[in-house]
Amino acid sequence: MLNRSSKAADFPLAAAFGIYTAAFLAVASPWLLGFVEVPWDSVSTFYPPFAFLARSIATGQSPFWTPNIFAGWPQIADPQALIFSPLHLLVALIDPKPTPRLFDGLTFGLLYIGGAGVILLFRDRGWHAAAAVAAALAFSLGGSAASRIQHIGQLQSLVFLPLAILMLSRALEHSSWLAGAAAGLFASFIVLGRDQVALVGAYVLVGFVLWHWLDGPGRGARFVASLKPLIAGVVVGACIITVPVALTVLLAQSSNRPDITFAHAVQGSLHPASLLMLAFADVFGASDFHREFWGPPSIPWHELIGQTGLYDSQNTGQIYTGALVAVSLLAFTLTRGVLWAREVRFFTVAAAMTLLYAFGKYTPVFGLLYGYLPGVSLYRRPADATFVLCGLLAIVSGYLIHRLLTGTLPLRRWQTVVAVLAVAAMVAISIVLARWAGMLESAVLPLLWGCGFLLVAVGALVLARRLAPQSAAAAAFVLAIYCAADFAWNNAPNESTGLPSSMYGALRSDTDDETLVLLRAKLKASAAPDRRDRVEMIGVAYHFPNIGLIHDLDHLYGHNPLRLALFEDATGAPDTVAAVRGPFTPLLPSYRSPLEDLFGVRFLAFGQPIEKLDPSVKPDDFPLVGRTKDAYVYENPRALPRVLLATRWQQADFAAMLRNGGWPDVDYQRTVLLERAPAVAPNSETPGTVRIMLYENTDIEIESDAPSGGFVVLNDIWHPWWRASVDGKPADILKANVLFRAVVVPPGKHVVRFKFEPLSGGWAELRSKLHAAPN
């Protein structure tokens, strides 16, 4: 057990937080003041669901299902919906129309929490306040958290890790069930991310417990003493995560990604050459608007150095965690026993294991983990582990700085020689690679800047060491100023992290974007009691696919790596339609098809003329009704209403239709396709009427008047968590026309209600899967 109480009492906590806050705000100011916004996935994948969450709460609706994307989507099971993000949920409860700028503020709020947790962890361990501030800034403003700030869910999975470790450490050392419960709370916030960063973070916490049990004598006593706090933590965590995680697992099993093959996963490995960016932030040109990216797996690298077999974005390998981190690791890692000291040994091993995980196919370790460690096979891109890796490196380097500032780090001349040689080797490797790739001229300036920052970092450490005995706050101030300058320059807004706010006017609730204004006007003009027309927006802008979540437009597609397998099989929907929609399918062979009409796609906004996307369409098939600066807007005059009253039915093999296409030649306003005959099967020529009485996210009421009975067909995606009733009595929801919903109604006037019930529906689905599983 560490004796920390006296050292913690001497820790200038207020000064540390004040200095950390000032430096943090200085670096974050371009975003917080609204000059730039976090782009790409932040504005396309995460902000729209957040706006939908706030809008739903403000209008008294449940946010658990949305009709605005993919013909219907279970938000409650989607980690990107942010429903279970404590910070986002709190703000959504308060603000009905949160702006993108506020959303960026919450993003930096998450990062701030991560750094604050590091300071508290250092204080608890009796480590130097100046080292705590340096580590906190590296954790919150460096590494993958900075370069991949657009991935909001992964940030959330990371930032609570220091607080979880802090409370877990207290729980284990003091056998405190209160601390254990707090550890379970913060651990649950990590797991609620339900992504690979959450998985790696969870395993770090598991490893922390195992380390506590096994490290040193008295293992049995430690194990027994830990049971009470661990049980408290497990109970608290289980109460929070069980439902969201279970629903996400069920969604994944019915999605386009029920699992990830090893070959697919390792396409997202971290290339070893990316380690050069620990010291040289932009040696490969990954964040410079005016330079060509040449690192792995770019085109120059593949053409002139060799194929990598990787499929990563250019910012995946940007792991620059600050020059202080690089200097401390390069200069002091080889100091005998320092990183193996008991108080930091776990973090050293955890960082090493996380690095091996991130390397993916480049070591045998990931293959073993993929095969034997639960959860690993669910995710692609092991390089996502760099979020946790960089956070752990910030803590380890902070410990090294603590040892330096407290005079307990043995300093020898050979350490300086080794550090210089290490930097020289990294420079030499960078130059050789740049020459091979034909990018030497592009790499020289970043290398010079990197060497300059490393040199100044040495000076900052020397000055801080001199000031530390007299004033911990003064030493912290020196290191904070340096870190702020370092990150303000090397992690400044770039094409991956910060683009002008003026680019995203369409995201605002009061937008005057001409494409959206035109679509809204057309939809209003086409409104009818049985209609809720959909739109299709392809190739307009990166942030458009999910924009319906903000403005309550029902877009046929969206932006999400997950789609229901049924929907993807039917439509060929890709992750996003920001550029192109992807290939057509047998069931949807053209925009001129029965499925497009059944979806009720009335208006189509394309970034290029429709005939370029679908050469098979004829000029009169889709009249051009508008031309904006971003889109050609067409009308589909054949789009069917959202609700239909079919009085006839015809049997069809849906699986064969998905494979081969071939829609029967029937009138889909009067005839519904079913896989099997229902218990009561109306078949009449007598028409009826149907109208929408209520259409909310999770509650839909439809009034039908069928003299001879019939089928109320709702052209929303079929999903097992929906329930139906006719005049208040439970009714079966039939899968209709391959992927839609239908309910049998008897003769006369009736009210059909569709209700989304994820808890009972999810439980029923889970039970059916368990019963169907082999014994």
Where are these regions (language model features)?
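Hydrophobic alpha-helical membrane-insertion signals
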Residues: S6-A77, R101, I241, A246-P258, ...
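Membrane-interface coil-to-helix junctions
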Residues: A23-V118, L137-P162, H264-A323, A358-V376, ...
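Transmembrane helix irregularities
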Residues: I94, L141, A145, L172, ...
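Transmembrane-helix signature of polytopic, membrane-embedded enzymes
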Residues: V118-S140
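Contiguous transmembrane helix-bundle modules in multi-pass membrane proteins
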Residues: A136, H151-F160, M167-L185, V197-A198, ...
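Polar, glycine-rich mid-to-C-terminal structural blocks
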Residues: V197, A225-D282, A476
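Active-site-proximal, structured, solvent-exposed surfaces of multi-pass membrane proteins
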Residues: L356, N546, Y557, Y668-N775
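Extracytoplasmic/lumenal acceptor-recognition loop(s) of multi-pass membrane glycoenzymes
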Residues: A476-V601, T628, V633-V680, H719, ...
